[in-house]
Amino acid sequence: PSAATITAASHALIGTGEPPYRTGILANEWWRRDLGRSLKAVEAEDGTMTAKWLRLPGLSDAIAAAKTGGKAVSVSLKDRAAILPLGHAGTAIWYDARRVAWTSIAPSAWLTEWNASHPIAAHLHDVWTALPETPGLARVADDAPGEVGEVGLGPTFPHALDATRNPASAIFATPLGNDLVFDTATEAIDREQLGADTHPDLLILSLSAHDYIGHGWGQESWESWDAVLRLDRRIDQFLGDLDAKVGAGRWAMIVTSDHGACPMPESLHGGRISFAQIKDAANRAAIAELGPGEWIANARYPTLYLSRAALAQKPRDLAVAMTKIVYALRSFPGLERVEKSADFWGNCETRTGDAFLICITLDPERSGEIVYMPAKGWVLEDSDEGVATGHGSLQSYDRQVPVIVLPPGRTAHAALTGPDDTTIPMARIAPMLAGWLGVPPPSSLRAPATP
């Protein structure tokens, strides 16, 4: 329900039930003028991982506050995807590619044992090959236009991890990454004794590999289809494990996505824009009013941050320069909506349409001075990286995602009536889960003390 169709912002929304302007998590990272650099959404100033930038309680905080005896655990390849949906309590587990091991904010004895008994390094020579069914489902060439590969893996199968510069990082963009998440989640069920008593527990899995695969090869690619096939089979296995360990009908689940994705730009007559191009165009527009200088500090989506030098200009000169930047970026190919952020601060409830979505995405303390959105068929990329496709726009393909709800008392393999077109706002997921857990929704709790 916001314009921030980005991993960190959406995971915070799923776990709190509140949009970015309330959670404070407006993107995967944002510019810190006091530090002179970007800071990740779950990164402390010293580089350690933290939930302190999340202004609101999450589901784990609701469980802790209710004192039900329930536990909360999350597992993901991504740190932000493990930490933010939980909140400030619970056990968040993610993959640290530098250590080639699982890690968490607080030490965990069983996780240390798990890393030792099931070392991820043993997989660094794995080779990802396509399943026999994959080509027929994809219906495109293995090396379709726009595919660039990801984290050192090339455009075509097979994909050998040890053929990359950093096999440990290449794990992120293969089905192996999801398999490792499932394996660790299954171990967490046993070691944390999840579902072993009458106190409802929470287990969150964020299966991030398909996101990386989409960025590198696109949603229509062999790689994407192959990953989905393998994921479907692994989910089936995991649900069977839940039946065996917890008991059929004794667990409930919601399956959804933090965001959608743009089809390959080549299919929509779109294209790709780098953040460097946006920054350069904005700086040229500022120079036309303010003269030579570095007037733009950062242009990472969804907002552009002016430099300290720009903000030190006389108010009238700064206002004119900002207007020129806005008009320059509006004429930039691939950008659909460019506005001054201050025009969207406050009174979000009175706004409608895109204006409402932009309003609930921005944070006066953390957002930049200018907000911009890519047009249909256009995606944003790092100039030194390159992507096949991406997400992070107002477009329906980014904002509308499937959701599967299996309420308490239902069994996973029972016949379903089939999909329908019922719309469930993402903000309803946290209250729904809280109700199942027998705890107050996170939004009803007092916010934690955060910077």
Segments from the language model and where they lie:
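Long, low-complexity, polar/charged, intrinsically disordered or flexibly structured peripheral segments
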Residues: 122-189, 195
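Active-site segment of extracytoplasmic enzymes that catalyze sulfate/phosphate-ester chemistry
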Residues: 1-49, 92-96, 153-163
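Secreted, luminal/periplasmic, and some membrane-associated catalytic domains
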Residues: 28-48, 56, 61, 86-88, ...
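Substrate-binding rim/cap in mid-to-C-terminal beta-strand-loop elements of soluble/periplasmic
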Residues: 277-321, 388-437, 451
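Active-site regions of oxyanion-processing enzymes, predominantly non-cytosolic
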Residues: 70-76, 82-83, 178-212, 371-372
